[in-house]
Each structure stands twice: as structure tokens, then as C-alpha cells.
């Protein structure tokens, strides 16, 4: 499967690209700057210490056009501009949105959640794309970039997924479970992205409080 990681030069995108490439998928890292994307693809090969992985860099629009599914891994402030640049390219495809509405608190390193009129970043993306058949899922919001980039062990975190489209839920779940240690959790409709996205600032602040980098979440006692 060809997977575009849009805005994939940051830690979250790089980590997802790395893990999915290691799982045997064909990954295209996208960026506004194609040269940065090419450099990020090279970094994936260096971290993996392999030169046989199927990973390359391109502009966001080129990556989205070529891929079968796109994962959006940009800061909130870049979400809508990035979606605008790839809107035609992802027409009729599945978009997995990992955007989290957070901002740094003044005077400290802690982060806080930003309330959005649409309810969540994923719902905002879905409304922007709703007239062209793009199915949106919220996923990968709560998974630590540090854990993704540390390939010496599995990722100790569930992936909470929400979407109004069954095929998007299933595809996001399939990709999540290609990452060693990750279990996909079907959280229902996209409205639940409002809760999923709010967990991330809590995890980040727990990291800061406990001087760690990879706090995660597990949902217990679910049926197999």
C-alpha cells in the first residue's frame, strides 16, 4: 500500500513513516519543501540502518496524489493550509488526521488544549473535505513520537480511532496494528475525536511532570 505522510518531516510524521516502512509499506513523506522531505526519507533509512525500505520524499501534493491513503501529521496552525494544498489529490481517498489542537502555555513548557468551533481538528478536516468524497478518520493522536522513533522496542500504546466511515476506520486500524505493540481501538463516530484529541495534552504534560518522553494510554477489559 502507498501511504503519504503529509507534513512528515516532524517527529510524529517521521516516526510513523519509519514504523510503516519497517512494516513493509511503501511510504511517501510529504512536505511543503521537497528537499526537506527527501532528507527526512534518508533519515528514516539511517535510523532503521537499512537501505531496502520503500520510502521517499516529495511535496505534500505529489505525495497525496501518488498515495492510496494519506496521514496528516502537521501542527494545528498548518492543518487547513496543508489540506488546501492537497484537497484535489485526496479526493475520494481516506485521510487519517493526527492533528491535535494544542498550544504552549505562556511562561512554561506545559501545553493546553485549544477548543475549536468544529469540535475537533478531525471534524474540521471532514467538513472542509465533505463535498468530495474524502473519508476522514482521527488516529495516531495519542502515540508518542519518541516511542515511534525508538525502534529498539515496541510502542506501548493503544491507537484510539474515530470515523463516520467504516472503510476509514478499518484502514486506520490496519495501519495502526502494523506498528509493533500498538492495538487499534474502534471508538465509533468522528464526534469522538473531540475526546481522543484532548487526551494528548494530558499525556504531554505527564511526560513533562515525570521527565519522560513516551507516556501512552491503554484501554483495559475490552472483549477480544
UniProtKB/Swiss-Prot annotation:
Keywords: NADP, Oxidoreductase. The keyword Oxidoreductase applies. It comes from the Archaea. Catalyzes the reduction of NADP(+) with F420H(2) via hydride transfer, and the reverse reaction, i.e. the reduction of F420 with NADPH. Probably functions in the regeneration of NADPH required in biosynthetic reactions. The gene is fno. NCBIfam families: npdG. Homotetramer. GO terms for biological process: copper ion import; NADPH regeneration. Its EC number is 1.5.1.40. InterPro entries: NAD(P)-bd_dom_sf (IPR036291), NpdG (IPR010185), P5C_Rdtase_cat_N (IPR028939), STEAP_metalloreductase (IPR051267). It catalyses: reduced coenzyme F420-(gamma-L-Glu)(n) + NADP(+) = oxidized coenzyme F420-(gamma-L-Glu)(n) + NADPH + 2 H(+). NADP(+) binds at residues 9-12, 31-32, 36, 74, 100, 145. This is F420-dependent NADP reductase. GO terms for cellular component: plasma membrane. Belongs to the F420-dependent NADP reductase family. Optimum pH is 3.5 for F420 reduction with NADPH, and 8.0 for NADP(+) reduction with F420H(2). The lineage of its organism: Archaea, Methanobacteriati, Methanobacteriota, Methanomada group, Methanobacteria. One of its GO terms (molecular function) is ferric-chelate reductase (NADPH) activity. It holds the Pfam family F420_oxidored. It comes from Methanothermobacter marburgensis (strain ATCC BAA-927 / DSM 2133 / JCM 14651 / NBRC 100331 / OCM 82 / Marburg) (Methanobacterium thermoautotrophicum).
